[in-house]
């Protein structure tokens, strides 16, 4: 945590994010006790990792107010930049790459068929090319159990086993900030910063 970037996010990879206040498109409350909270800018995360066979260096690791995990800013060989979900033990200055038959190294992204069984992975696609959907929150990972024909069998943290196409991509490692579950809110005001308003129990109402 001491190595987290203290400055502003990389501006071209952010966009505005309006608070819904728990309202839907009709202006009706659909999620109670939501509203106010600190203003946030959305960080555009690359869940696809489509810059194949191009090395990227980890430029910095940042806090993201929109998710529980940390995010890493990558600088590619063509000087373009992208944010990715930061895996545990990824350090500033590390090299990562995306593509087929790459080294089994934290932060590298490749199809499941190129990963040995028993490996912990995160940001796993459910449909090839649709971007990572599984295991994206702090401390999350899934285990590659084995293969069945054109399918890979993955075991989720819930204990459920799922089959996905072996061509689907995943990133090696576990998601960072696994201590997030131990955070003590400490005071009501901290929940207000997060946009959570007091929730009245139904039994306490008239």
Regions found by a protein language model. Name each.
Residues 1-67, 88-206:
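Basic, glycine/proline-rich low-complexity segments that contact nucleic acids
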Residues 66, 74-76:
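Structural recognition of beta-strand segments within beta-rich domains
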Residues 79-91:
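Beta-strand/loop nucleic-acid-binding surfaces
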């Amino acid at each position: 945590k001491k190595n987290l970037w203290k400055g502003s996010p990389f501006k071209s990879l952010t966009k505005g994010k309006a608070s819904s206040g728990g309202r839907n498109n009709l202006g009706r409350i659909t999620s109670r006790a939501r509203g106010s909270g600190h203003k946030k800018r959305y960080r555009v995360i690359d869940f696809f990792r489509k810059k194949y066979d191009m090395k990227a260096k980890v430029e910095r690791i940042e806090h993201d107010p929109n998710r529980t995990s940390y995010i890493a800013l990558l600088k590619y060989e063509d000087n373009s930049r992208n944010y990715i979900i930061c895996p545990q033990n990824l350090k500033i200055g590390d090299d990562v790459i995306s593509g087929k038959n790459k080294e089994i190294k934290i932060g590298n992204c490749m199809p499941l068929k190129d990963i040995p069984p028993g490996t912990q992975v995160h940001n796993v696609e459910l449909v090839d090319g649709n971007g990572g959907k599984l295991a994206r929150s702090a401390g999350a990972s899934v285990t590659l159990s084995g293969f069945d024909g054109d399918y890979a069998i993955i075991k989720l943290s819930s204990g459920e086993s799922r089959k996905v196409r072996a061509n689907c991509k995943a990133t090696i490692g576990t998601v960072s900030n696994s201590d997030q579950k131990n955070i003590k809110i400490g005071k009501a005001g901290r929940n207000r910063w997060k946009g959570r308003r007091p929730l009245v129990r139904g039994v306490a109402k008239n």
